[in-house]
């Protein structure tokens, strides 16, 4: 769940992050698109869902130098929530 507060500043993150995800074996399942809340009080405006081979790989990506050097481009230009979920 992410709300972009500064599209111009966020663009740098959008351009850089896909390569970091791919480098660590991840892929986008959802990136933007229409959001239609059905139940509860949560009203996200933009969703991004990534898939990685396993939780260890996801954490390796998140903590990688590649990702950490661009994370401020996301946090300084958006508000959001992020969760890691292990599943199948």
Question: Could you tell me what each predicted segment is?
Answer:
Residues 55-83:
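C-terminal structural segments of small proteins and small subunits
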